Amino acid sequence: MATRRAIVPEQQQEPSSPASEISKNKDGQEQSEMVSPMEEEGFCWPGPKSVALRRTSDGFGFTLRHFIVYPPESAVHTSIKDEENGNRGVNTGRPRNKLEPMDTIFVKQVKEGGPAHEAGLCTGDRIIKVNGESVIGKTYSQVIALIQNSDSTLELSVMPKDEDILQLAYSQDAYLKGNDSYSGNAHHIPEPPPLCYPRIKPAASVMAQPVEVPPSGTSLAKQQSSRPVRTATTQPDRSYRVEIQVPPSPTELVKSNTAVCVCNEAVRTVLVPSEKVVDLSSNRTNRAGPLHRTEEVRYGLADPSILKRTTSPTSSIPHVQMVPTARQFDNAGVIGKPPSYGGHAENMFSTRPTAQAEGSPSPTNHYSSPGPHQQIDWRNYKTYKEYIDNRRMQMYGCRTIQERLDSLKAASQTTTDYNQMLPNHFSGQSRRRSTSHDRVQQSVQMRQRSVSQERLEDPVLMKEWPRSASQDTLSSAVASRNHRSESWDYHARKGDFDQFIVETQSNGERKHNYKWSGFTEQDDRRGITERPRQHSFHMSLRSPNFTMAPVPYTSFAHPLQKVHPDVKTIQPTRQNSYRSPHPRPAVSDRSGFAVSKSNSVKIPTPCASKSYSPSVRSDDGIVIDQKPVNYMHVSGPQNFQRKTQTESASGFQLDSVKTSMSASSSPPANTKPAKQVKHSTATSQNVDVKKTPSPEANAGDSDAVLTPVDQVVLREKPSPGQQTSPPIRQQSYIFAVNEQEGVSDTTCWLPNDARREVHIKRIEQRKASGSNSPGNSLASIPFIDEPTSPSIDHEIGNIPASAVISISEQPLPTITTVPPSPTSPVPLMRRHFSHDHDSIRPSILEVNSKTERSKSCDEGLDDYKEEGKLGLKQGSSLKGVQARENVPSSEDSESRKDSSSDVFSDSNKEGFLYFRQVTTEKGKRVSGSIRPWKQMYVVLRGSALYLQKDKKEQTGHSSAQSDEEQLIGINGCLIDISYSETKRKHVFRLTTSDREFLFQAEDRDDMLAWIKAIQENGNLNDEQTDQASRVLISKRIKEYNTMMSSASNKSEQSPKAPRQTLSIRQPFRATRPDGKLQSPHSPKQESERRLFSKDDISPPKDKGSWRRIMKNPFEKKPITGGTFGVRLDDCPPAHNNKYVPLIVDVCCKLVEERGLEATGIYRVPGNNAAISSMQEDLNKANTDIDIQDDKWRDLNVISSLLKSFFRKLPDPLFTNEKYNDFIEANRTEDPVERLKTLKRLILDLPDHHYETLKYLSAHLKTVADNAELNKMEPRNLAIVFGPTLVRTSEDNMTHMVTHMPDQYKIVETLIQKHDWFFSDESADEPITTVHEESTVESQPVPNIDHLLPNIGRTGLSPGDVSDSATSDSAKPKGSWGSGKDQYSRELLVSSLFAAASRKRKKPKDKPQPSSSEDELDNVFYQKELSQVEFQIPDKQNVDKDADLKAKANALSFKDADNIKGTNIITEDKLESDIMHSESTSPCLPKLLEPPKENHRLQVPSDDKTIPQISFQMEESMSDSGTMLSNSSQASAQRSKPKVVSPEFKGHDFLTADVSSITSDYSTTSSTIYMTGLDPNPISPEVQSVAESKGEEADDERSELISEGRPVETDSENDFHIFASSLAFNRQHRSKEEDPPRNVQANAEGSPSCTEGSITPRLDTRRFSSHKLIECDTLSRKKSVRLKTDSECSAESKNEETLSDAHEVMKKSRSPINVDTTANNEPEEPAWRIKITDRLKLRLKASADDMFGIGSQKAHAAETRKKKNIRRRHTLGGQRDFAEISVLNAWKINEPSSKEVELSAVDRLKPKCPSQDLSISDWLARERLRTSTSELSTVEPEEKHISETTGQKESVSPSPPPSSSPSQVSTADIPTGSESPSLGTAPQSDDQMNGDSFQSKNKNNFSPAVDAHPHKLSGTQVVRSRFYQYL
């Protein structure tokens, strides 16, 4: 349209030529489309482009969208076409009724790369011609047929989307499902005969005036000349705008009602001055011109002359303004849009006087144009209703709803009103919903138009802005009253408002020349923006001084509306400036435009201020419209009456903006309007192009700029009911233009606040009456087809559907009939609100634009009204992007659309609900106490929820809604079931853009029904809803992420919690409505939730609820059915594999998605509470798993959940039936045969088991493939899953112990050979033998035979063991600490001790490879073994030790793998046995050997054992990556010097094995803790393992491991120290103590590793068990140290005596030795005492410095903590504690001279050889010495021993309780480093252990210093996790 030439149209008398000129002016082409079908010329826009497509096999590569634009009823009945034709042929134009719905067809989608794409066809291009054949008048199917029937080439003439007025105007509707922008050329749409019904009375009035084109000499005439104004005589083919003074009833037409007929050949819209102006003029009907069809009209509008032809010649200012509008179009290209508006823009500009403008220039003649009614002349009908009915019948058989609305309105409205209105209609027939005469002062009668017409009250605007036919129809029906609003909207929309140049003629008639401010395509495109322009336009129309009016309008303009940059305050002074070419400044220009007529200026003040200025405001700021203002305009009809006559100040005050708009009248008002206009201008900036169509138009355009406001503020059309009398806007427009200057002025002067108040009052009245909204609702009902109406509707926004409904119910809705209606500002209120929120408006439009206008209108009205209310009542309404007024739209909004009755239907759903607001408008959460639950009667209407205290008769519907009602807009809302917000049941959460609410329904069905209804109503506007929903969803996601980051455990614990991610509250709420257990991330949460839900609970439904609420938090509901504990075939199946349980599928996928790089995945336990909660939720038959729930964020919980699932299977995955077969098959010696047998057995599994196993093994293989990252090698995974998958239903301890290696190996093999096992190629020979050997199988499988005899003894442990074996879930961190656990540990230790003894008797030469970790262990073990063996030959007990080693290795690998829990038990028992047992080396080594399996240090009793143990410890340390190996080495070395050393070696070896086993099973710290192994820790670990089996989560150690830090427990710390010191003491005293200690550490570590708790035991800084925690980086790092240490210790073991080792230990622990110096000589009694103490300490697990041991323990614990080890398990070994104390003493003394350490070592030496000396005594002495800081260097033997022991003891020296923890820690940490210091050999050993790297003491200390096994160098102490823990 911008290209439209501003050709001066011929005299108005020559409509046709002006029309054509106009079209040419606008487009530079004939505006045939707009002008009339006969003038089917290109658009006035730059014009259609031709696209040639060649057919391909895929077709032409594009799809079309159908958008039917229904001409307004008024247009049809008024025969706007006829009028246009008549104007061209004077009323002989095609009858409006001939106007058929215009099928606008535009490109929906272009296939990329297709012919269309290549040809440049774009989505949104409107199809104008197909192969040269116009699509206008053709149905969609016909067009499709044309295209499909085309030859290989298809030639399309398309209007680019950006230039397609229909789409621009109906941007919202066009893309709604029911509203496609008309894609055909508007020119094809037959120009509706001018719908200008010259009102007999107002015939000369406004309509005629505006239509009359002033002499071409006049500025207006010039504008017209530039833009031919189509007078009745001038009948452009497309559309022309004729301003016809619509004589309202003389009374009402205080001002001549100028109805500008925008005559589009296709659509004749009488541009009634915006309802503001024209509303009174009685015909919104004139708007009947379909907005969509308006395109032609718009093009026609280009004809300024028509505008000029406005009937009122009196106005000094030529109507040229209208013409300028056309030019504006040209300039802004908006004109093009106006054409798309159908008659509005162009018609407004070129509006032939409809009948009159074309027929006769005289203002009065606008009615005269016989065509206005085309077939139906409103004048011929006594009542508007009749007219509308007939017209509808003729036109289209108008939409049902429209008809109903019209009928209702007509019925309610008085004939007089309609007659009065009719003239306006006449003017506005073509495009104007109602012409000014329709709207004009016949406000009441005008109100009689159909509500929809009322709604379309601003016919001019609407005309200019193509509306859906329904809108047009509505406008026509409601035109008189709504004209203003509609015109307004249209103006606002148009941006180029055809400024209704309303000149108040001397007779008081105003010429309303709608100068179309350049309504830009964009504006056109976005109905909202355009509508504000329309509003501005209407405002300008309404205000005599458009220029000024825009200003006031601006003030009214909604803030949301952008004021076009050009749109400056439309100053009344600009009345004449209207001519000025600059459209956007046009706000003032518009004022000028309005001012063009002096009368107009005056009148504009009232009218303009009311109509026009609101228009501007509405347009510009319909937002500003002060919603009240627009709404006032909406109610304008009433106000309009008032305006017309009294222009009720209040009404106009709403319109005060309008008043302000009348520039001349009230400059201040203008200022406001200017503001608003700016908004409008912003909206209409695009429109502005249209604004400047003609020079004068340009001037006017400046004024019009308001109208062009980019932001199309939906001017709230007064609901017809609301303003039964012409809407204020009508009044303001028409009266302002025509008659009431003073009144307008008065109104204008009302401040926005006053207007708002008035508006609010009106709304209230409307609510009260229930009828006030009727008119408004209709007016506000957005037409689906017409974006304008929606915008108008938005303007009117407050008119709720209920109002519409009430209209149907009551005559009040009729604008004409109910002048008071204006009092109800509802429609007015939010129209601009809607505009403010384009998004809202679109949604509303979409909602409204649901094909059925009435519905959409209804909803729109409701929406807008609601919005207005909300806007007035609550600022949040705007936020609500939701049109709150939309409530009226029923769930079946479509049905509502279908019929008026639907429109008037009450509510979609209503009923009592408990309601609580969760967040305030500011997004702040509201506590229940502040806003408790309240029972409210909730009515769902359209897109709004009305909350009432009690059920009210819904007479007023939403319009009747009382102030007390709370309105919640639901457009774009998110609604979901709330589980976390409250404990209440059946609660659903409604989240709007700004607030959150909870509603409690009576039952689930009711809740679901509400949710469905709200979703349906809230999503009526797909586009906007999607946008709003996206915003909300994004907001929720952000909140969710915040919540997750802040509290990952705060997810809703609802069984489903399916939408938690969307829950904004979730972050804030911890309670669940159900009172169901929260995801037990923490019990605290649940209590918090309970607290939160208190208010929710406040209205408890029943005692049961209370009971449930109170009970649930504390007790778990029994799991019934569902997923866990049921057979595989009963589990909910995965979506893609019916044989795989859903839980398995989900967990595996989540782990693969997020956990492949998670260290220790499946090893690290998850939160037991969370797991339990998830299990409960899943057991509730929740097949829909919301993996977005934060509960599914914790990978450890997910992995534990998976393990728990398999653990709880009634029939294990490998089935009870085949369990023994699998075990036997695994024991097949031939690897190939073994694999084949296993495969055969697997294939024999039931389908569910087979598929699940296949799926799981594939998953585990995937995990193992990422072992580099997650450290979970097949063996580690096998350790975790073996006992879980390969088991029997009954937890058989014997099976667990005996079959654990098999279980591990089977699973490991499955993982490694998954492809082979589950491939169909059974013939393939398994390649696993070598591979497995190389990987894990090469490692010895732990031999658990020695454990079996003790199984019975350890009655407590079976479950624990089985749990640990399961290791799926670990016991709670404190599990070891429990007295029961302690006891079970004791039992385990005893049994393990005995088993260890037996095992020692049965030496195993070669460990069996069980898993990768075992391999690692074996590697270390072998290394150590070689060393140990080297030592062993030196040792007496070499054989014995070797056996022990072999056994230990086998046991450690096999047992550890198979029975970590058992091993733990064994270790614990061994330790306890050792502790209890005499220092006899044999017993201890034996005991230690089983611990070997678990902990290599377990064998400290014999010197021989000690070296072995040292070796084992080294190995274990290597395996565990902890200090254990060092400690064990230290112990072993210390043992070495003694005879026991070989055994110790064996024990050490065993310890290493145990450690490795442990490490294998529990990736964490078994090795680390090996030195610190303690019988108690072991037992607890066994228990924890057992528990872990029962519980979902893995043990703490695993968690610690997952954290990447050595997992330690207090017991472990104790164990470390104990192991070290104990081993040392045992080695020295009995050489067995330390090994046992180490063994304990290992055992403990092993169990903990198994469980995850063991890891803590590995606490010795040597957590490096790479094997144990291959997965753990820490463990690997530590393993390196361990290896070094192990090697060193091994070396020391090999060659050095226990004394050397002892020295090494001393050296490493030199600082501590100070304290322990006194205890240099361990005494056996002391040893036993130490054991006792240790037991005591164990019982006292948490005692800090018990006997000084506690303090050391504490220190060790600190050290471990320093190492980031959080978990505290009960300290397991009292012996260790004592030793820990010693160790602490060493640590303390470590700083002291190494001499002292040497002394201590020396003291210890005597003990070392005999091992009779108890380490405890020695440590005590050392401690004393430490305190005295006397340390005697120990011999190299002792150095080595101490080196080894030091490492061990660094882990757990127990004797020096007094030693400071820091020293202990230091000693522990430096153990490795000290060891190197001790001696080269010891250093090597330590280096092997990894100590050498860390050990300073080794290097720093002399061998003598290191000789003190209990002394750890500061480094060792620091390194020692135990110390850190302490």
Swiss-Prot record:
It is found in: Golgi apparatus membrane; Cell junction; Cytoplasmic vesicle membrane; Cytoplasm, Cytoskeleton. It is a peripheral membrane protein. GO terms for molecular function: GTPase activator activity. InterPro entries: PDZ, PDZ_6, PDZ_sf, PH-like_dom_sf, PH_domain, Rho_GTPase_activation_prot, RhoGAP_dom. Residues 906-1019 form the PH domain. Gene3D superfamilies: 1.20.5.220, 2.30.42.10, Pleckstrin-homology domain (PH domain)/Phosphotyrosine-binding domain (PTB), Rho GTPase activation protein. Keywords: Cell junction, Cytoplasm, Cytoplasmic vesicle, Cytoskeleton, Golgi apparatus, GTPase activation, Membrane. Residues 452-466, 1083-1105 have a biased composition (Basic and acidic residues). One of its GO terms (cellular component) is anchoring junction. Residues 77-162 form the PDZ domain. Residues 10-22, 216-236, 353-372, 416-429, 468-479, 640-669, 1044-1064, 1512-1534, 1639-1653, 1866-1902 have a biased composition (Polar residues). The record marks 1163 as: Arginine finger. Residues 1-41, 211-236, 353-378, 416-487, 571-592, 640-704, 868-905, 1044-1107, 1330-1381, 1396-1416, 1512-1540, 1573-1598, 1626-1658, 1827-1915 are annotated as: Disordered. It comes from the Eukaryota. Pfam families: PDZ_6 (PF17820), PH (PF00169), RhoGAP (PF00620). GO terms for biological process: Golgi localization; signal transduction. Residues 441-451 have a biased composition (Low complexity). SUPFAM superfamilies: GTPase activation domain, GAP (SSF48350), PDZ domain-like (SSF50156), PH domain-like (SSF50729). Residues 1126-1318 form the Rho-GAP domain. GTPase-activating protein (GAP) for rhoa and cdc42. This is Rho GTPase-activating protein 21-A. It comes from Xenopus laevis (African clawed frog).
